[in-house]
Regions:
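Cyclic nucleotide-binding regulatory module and flanking cytosolic helices
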Residues: 1-37, 44, 78, 83-85
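N-terminal positioning helix adjacent to the helix-turn-helix/winged-helix DNA-binding module
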Residues: 122, 145, 149-152, 174
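A generic structural signal for short hydrophobic patches within well-formed alpha-helices
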Residues: 39, 110-111, 216
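Short helix-to-loop capping/linker segments positioned immediately adjacent to catalytic or ligand/cofactor-binding
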Residues: 91-92, 111-117, 136-145, 163-166
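Cyclic nucleotide-binding regulatory domains
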Residues: 32, 37-98
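Phosphate-/nucleic-acid-contacting segments
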Residues: 152, 156-217
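Long, low-complexity, charged/polar intrinsically disordered regions in eukaryotic proteins
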Residues: 122-141
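Cyclic-nucleotide recognition modules
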Residues: 26, 69-128
Length: 217
């Protein structure tokens, strides 16, 4: 856990001794969740979390049970920071995308820890994390702005290719999660992926995609 926390953006620039003190003041608790396990739900008290292993999805679920995936949280990354800083209940649900170990911190502890060594740096780190997450959410809005399933897939996969520095990309979603993220029907999306492969746009196996150099067809 210490290796993950030492590299986590939330604790960047905070010496180990100060980090240990902050964790105590914030009521740190390590919990394990099975795949599809609920880490927290919409309306729960605010919680600040760091993924230690596995991965989580941040979701919006309406009263009819329709789910939209807003983000994927990988090891070392943070979730719940906006609600913890605002002192508001969770406005989203967070679910384990696979077996995951998570460090949970009390949201209200952010204010209670004021004056604790490293607290000011922690808040600065949270500001940077929030800004970067807003950029990620903005990119999702670009992907879902496309009117066709193909357009949404191309927008998302192109963005991943840029982020990963090559035409071979590994995405953090399975098919259902990708469909939920892009706001499309899974069966229709799978059919469109098959058509895109037939058209020579890409090849894929599970969550690994290779984008061809030309996007014709």
């Amino acid at each position: 856990m210490e290796k993950i926390l030492a590299k986590a953006p939330l604790f960047q620039g905070i010496p180990e001794g100060e980090r240990v003190g902050l964790l105590e003041r914030l009521g740190a608790e390590v919990r394990w969740f099975p795949k599809a396990g609920a880490v927290c739900r919409n309306g729960d008290p605010a919680v600040l979390g760091v993924v230690l292993s596995g991965g989580l999805t941040v979701e919006n679920v309406d009263v009819w049970g329709n789910k939209t995936i807003l983000d994927h949280i990988a090891p070392g990354q943070v979730f719940g920071e906006a609600f913890a800083c605002a002192g508001e209940p969770m406005g989203v649900s967070v679910t384990a995308a696979e077996e995951s170990e998570v460090l949970l911190l009390r949201g209200e502890g952010l204010l209670e820890a004021r004056g604790c060594p490293g607290h000011e740096r922690l808040l600065r780190n949270l500001l940077v994390i929030s800004a970067r997450k807003n950029l990620r959410l903005s990119r999702r809005s670009f992907h879902t702005a496309a009117k066709t399933i193909r357009g949404r897939l191309l927008s998302y996969l192109s963005d991943q290719a840029v982020a990963q520095g090559g035409r071979e990309v590994v995405i953090p979603f399975d098919r259902q999660q990708l469909a939920d993220y892009l706001g499309v029907d899974r069966s229709a999306m799978s059919h469109e992926l098959s058509r895109m492969r037939e058209d020579g746009l890409l090849t894929y196996r599970k969550n690994r995609f290779v984008l061809n150099e030309t996007l014709e067809g």
